[in-house]
From Swiss-Prot:
Residues 239-264 are annotated as: Disordered. Belongs to the 14-3-3 family. PROSITE patterns: 1433_1, 1433_2. Gene3D superfamilies: 14-3-3 domain. It comes from the Eukaryota. SUPFAM superfamilies: 14-3-3 protein. It comes from Mesembryanthemum crystallinum. InterPro entries: 14-3-3, 14-3-3_CS, 14-3-3_dom_sf, 14-3-3_domain. Residues 246-264 have a biased composition (Basic and acidic residues). Pfam families: 14-3-3. Is associated with a DNA binding complex that binds to the G box, a well-characterized cis-acting DNA regulatory element found in plant genes. This is 14-3-3-like protein.
């Protein structure tokens, strides 16, 4: 079998796995495709499939971690030490899985995806992805490991931002998605609500001023992310926003609905 037909076969299998909601296998198929691209970069469709696969695999564990951490806090406040030690052990198991998933995509980004990226769009996409997965590590790591993960997140997002501001339109969905996730990083990880709000507001205002230039292709994607930016701004600036009362929005992986056409 030629490498081209093998690549097509893996892409098709990834699509099947997505439909079946077997995201671990979807990751495996798309990793094979990514490793075939030593010089040639992934197509937009392949890039989006890889993103969706990893976002679903990590998303399930992030949700589990949040639930378990919440239960742990409640048990601690009740003084149930036996339960707390059991929960801590279980949380550790989830954290091991989270670390493994993040390490997998970060290694792939470093070894194949970022070096082979040739367009501004793909460079921003992969650097944003690098920032996202370092941020997911920072969500649960502690001490020096958390500090390192946060620093790596900041470096990746800043590198992506430098290219995005110079090369992509303010209405470009990838530039908007970067602003959304970068602002979430400032708010949640660095505990800098002012920076988070400034970044989100600037991205929103710049996109609004150029909304009439949007083609039909990306109108839906761009306006959806703009709505998420506005939702977060509303949450962050409301005086009576209780912590955890609302969910902070992030850029979803493309094609998560299974119906949406991938952004070109």
């Amino acid at each position: 079998m030629s490498s081209e037909s093998s690549r097509e076969e893996n892409v098709y299998m990834a699509k099947l796995a997505e439909q079946a909601e077997r995201y671990e296998e979807m990751v495996e198929f798309m990793e094979k495709v990514a490793k075939m691209t030593d010089t040639e970069e992934l197509s937009v469709e392949e890039r989006n499939l890889l993103s969706v696969a990893y976002k679903n695999v990590i998303g399930a564990r992030r949700a589990s971690w949040r639930i378990i951490s919440s239960i742990e806090q409640k048990e601690e406040s009740r003084g149930n030490e036996d339960h707390v030690s059991t929960i801590k052990e279980y949380r550790g198991k989830i954290e091991t899985e989270l670390s493994k998933i993040c390490d997998g995509i970060l290694n792939l980004l470093e070894s194949h995806l970022i070096p082979s990226a040739s367009t501004a769009e793909s460079k921003v996409f992969y650097l944003k992805m690098k920032g996202d997965y370092h941020r997911y590590l920072a969500e649960f790591k502690t001490g020096a490991e958390r500090k390192e993960a946060a620093e790596n997140t900041l470096l990746a997002y800043k590198s992506a931002q430098d290219i995005a501001l110079a090369e992509l339109a303010p209405t470009h969905p990838i530039r908007l998605g970067l602003a959304l996730n970068f602002s979430v990083f400032y708010y949640e990880i660095l505990n800098s609500p002012d920076r988070a709000c400034n970044l989100a507001k600037q991205a929103f205002d710049e996109a609004i001023s150029e909304l009439d230039t949007l083609g039909e292709e990306s109108y839906k994607d761009s306006t959806l992310i703009m709505q998420l930016l506005r939702d977060n701004l509303t949450l962050w600036t409301s005086d009576n926003a209780e912590e955890g009362g609302d969910e902070i929005k992030e850029a979803a992986a493309k094609r998560e609905s299974g119906e949406e056409k991938p952004q070109q």
